[in-house]
A protein has these predicted regions:
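Catalytic cores of the polymerase beta-like nucleotidyltransferase superfamily
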Residues: 1-457
Length: 457
């Protein structure tokens, strides 16, 4: 790793910010994840600037900047749709609430500012005039060794801000680093501070973690250090719980493998994490098969996933998606008729099908370190069958029927009410079995038969 930083890596907007501050007589440094990522050869997602200019000076220097964190000395400069945080140098302060400093103390020394940061690899700065890397805590060595180490005394850092322990777990996954033993050992003693972190922040860290190639690295840290016992103890019920002969892993390790193999967005990966959460509460030994069974673990798991998602403040849409996928992650393939496939589509919802394909493939591949490709054949056949049924364009909801409630009331003389919806549901069932019946005359004839048989009026 070179001693000098290649300043050409920083975008023109960052150089413009630095030039404006220099023009007004202020010093500035490139800091944060942008420096860290550039030094390890990864294109930075964002760039931050630290400066000895005070907040009022920043507003004068950048009158169009958003005062996103002015209390803490931060403004956000927007250039060509991209956001750049510019922050006044700050020193250390007490953290009584376990999340925020009691008072903000602005300083002029970049080393003092870096000393308050969480990990050595994030406590690096670059002088934009020379490209010199300022590294008072050995962050460059830790980057080379791929080690995540707290700045200074780990227990002090974690006692200041409870979110830092969760960030440690995330960085282990997203950076693919190993956690320094002393840093890891400091997590459990500071869990009382971690308990002060809001559920929303925990959720956000989970979703950021899910962008890693192997998010299981983070969740293993959370398990080993006690964080998961605080945020989601239900998942821990699967640790060490053996499964049936088709699984090489216990419930916990299978969940980790499924999550890693689930090549979807972060919310889908949360569903993968929780898909078998109901197994420990449904496990029974079968005298007939001489093996473990987990009957209804999908339903039990969905009932467990709902309060977990509520507790972590997932949005309504995210919660519904996760719970639906846990509830419907089990399905069968061969031997299904077209009618059975249509019922399955109605049950799971057309908008969940692609998610279920991704989740099911990850579920199968997560049964062992290596899975025979023949094990994927049932899923491929199911996908082909569903594609054929969808291509046929047959009715899959009441809206697809050739008659509606108004037609039934007009042609059969029925009053409005819940009975109309029930009758439409009956017609959909008939059409599910025989799609050719989905035409007005046939449906009205069937409706008359149902009304006559049940005495509806």
């Amino acid at each position: 790793m070179n001693d000098a930083f290649d300043l050409r890596l920083a975008p023109a907007a960052v150089h413009g910010i630095v030039a404006r501050l220099r023009e007004l007589g202020f010093r500035s440094w490139l800091v944060g994840g942008g420096v860290r990522d550039a030094l390890r050869g990864v294109p930075p997602a964002d760039w931050d600037v630290a400066t000895d200019a005070r907040p009022d000076d920043l507003l004068r220097a950048f009158p169009k900047a958003a005062p996103t964190g002015l209390k803490h000395g931060t403004v956000t400069v927007v250039d060509d749709g991209k956001h750049y945080e510019v922050t006044t140098l700050r020193g250390e302060s007490a953290y009584s609430d376990g999340r925020h400093p009691d008072a903000v103390r602005f300083v002029d020394d970049i080393t003092a500012d870096l000393a308050r940061r969480d990990f050595t690899v994030n406590a690096l700065a670059v002088d934009p005039s020379t490209g010199a890397v300022i590294d008072p805590f050995g962050g460059k060595c830790d980057l080379q060794a791929r080690v995540l180490r707290a700045v200074g005394a780990p227990r002090e850092r974690f006692a200041e801000d409870g979110l830092r322990v969760l960030r440690a777990a995330r960085f282990v996954a997203t950076l693919e680093f190993e956690l320094d033993p002393a840093t890891a050992a400091a997590i459990a003693p500071t869990l009382d501070t971690f308990r002060k972190v809001s559920p929303e922040r925990v959720r956000d860290e989970w979703l950021k973690t899910m962008k890693a190639r192997s998010p299981s690295r983070a969740f293993e840290v959370m398990r080993a250090t006690g964080m998961l016992a605080v945020t989601c103890p239900e998942i821990l019920e699967g640790v060490g719980m053996a499964q049936n002969r088709w699984h090489a892993f216990d419930v916990w390790r299978h969940g980790m493998a499924c999550m890693d193999r689930c090549a979807g967005d972060p919310v889908l990966r949360v569903a993968a994490l929780l898909h078998d959460v109901g197994k420990p509460r449904t496990r029974e030994f079968s005298a007939k098969t001489k093996d473990w069974t987990f009957y209804d673990h999908d339903k039990v798991g969905a009932a467990m996933a709902e309060p977990i998602c509520e507790r972590l403040r997932f949005s309504t849409d995210e919660r519904r998606r996760i719970v639906d996928l846990v509830r419907h992650h089990l399905f069968h393939y061969d031997g299904w008729t077209d009618a059975a496939v249509r019922r399955w589509i109605r049950r799971v919802g057309r908008d969940r099908i692609e998610d279920l394909w991704t989740l099911n493939e990850a579920d199968v591949r997560g049964k062992a370190a290596a899975v025979d490709e023949a094990d994927m054949s049932p899923l491929r056949r199911m996908k082909e069958h569903v594609a054929r049924v969808l291509a046929a364009g047959d009715a899959l909801s009441v809206r697809d029927l050739a008659v509606d409630g108004s037609d039934l009331m007009r042609e059969l003389g029925l009053p409005p009410g819940k009975g109309i919806g029930v009758l439409l549901g009956e017609l959909l069932e008939r059409v599910t079995e025989e799609p050719a019946r989905n035409e007005p005359a046939a449906l009205l004839a069937i409706a008359r038969q149902i009304v006559a048989a049940r005495g509806m009026d």
